[in-house]
């Protein structure tokens, strides 16, 4: 593996994990804040709001896991190296 390809792969892996964590992190914070506000306004709808929140948090967390998978592929099974 050439030095330039190796350095670019490490940089791309770091960017993949970093950017994949920032977006869902902001989204999860916004969703949790909105859920707390909704439960405060309508306490009787807590179960429905909580279920929807947990499902949406799982989908958001999947985006972070996809970024981690991309980073691991770039580090250990690099398709750009012959």
UniProtKB/Swiss-Prot annotation:
One annotated GO molecular function: proton-transporting ATP synthase activity, rotational mechanism
Annotated site residues (Reversibly protonated during proton transport) in this chain? 61
Q: Does the keyword Flavoprotein apply?
A: no
Ranges annotated as spanning the membrane: 7-27, 57-77
Asked whether the keyword Chaperone is assigned, the reply is no
A cellular component annotation (GO) from this entry = proton-transporting two-sector ATPase complex, proton-transporting domain
Spell out the PROSITE patterns in the cross-references: ATPASE_C (PS00605)
User: Keywords assigned by UniProt?
Assistant: ATP synthesis, CF(0), Hydrogen ion transport, Ion transport, Lipid-binding, Membrane, Organellar chromatophore, Plastid, Thylakoid, Transmembrane, Transmembrane helix, Transport
* Location of the protein in the cell: Plastid, Organellar chromatophore thylakoid membrane
What is the membrane topology here?
Multi-pass membrane protein
Q: Note the Gene3D superfamilies from the entry.
A: F1F0 ATP synthase subunit C
Q: Return the NCBIfam families for the record.
A: ATP_synt_c (TIGR01260), PRK07354.1 (NF005608)
Q: Which family does it belong to?
A: Belongs to the ATPase C chain family.
Function according to Swiss-Prot or TrEMBL: F(1)F(0) ATP synthase produces ATP from ADP in the presence of a proton or sodium gradient. F-type ATPases consist of two structural domains, F(1) containing the extramembraneous catalytic core and F(0) containing the membrane proton channel, linked together by a central stalk and a peripheral stalk. During catalysis, ATP synthesis in the catalytic domain of F(1) is coupled via a rotary mechanism of the central stalk subunits to proton translocation. Key component of the F(0) channel; it plays a direct role in translocation across the membrane. A homomeric c-ring of between 10-14 subunits forms the central stalk rotor element with the F(1) delta and epsilon subunits.
Quaternary form?
A: F-type ATPases have 2 components, F(1) - the catalytic core - and F(0) - the membrane proton channel. F(1) has five subunits: alpha(3), beta(3), gamma(1), delta(1), epsilon(1). F(0) has four main subunits: a(1), b(1), b'(1) and c(10-14). The alpha and beta chains form an alternating ring which encloses part of the gamma chain. F(1) is attached to F(0) by a central stalk formed by the gamma and epsilon chains, while a peripheral stalk is formed by the delta, b and b' chains.
Stated name of the protein: ATP synthase subunit C, organellar chromatophore
The source organism is Paulinella chromatophora
Query: What gene name is given for the protein in this entry?
Result: atpE
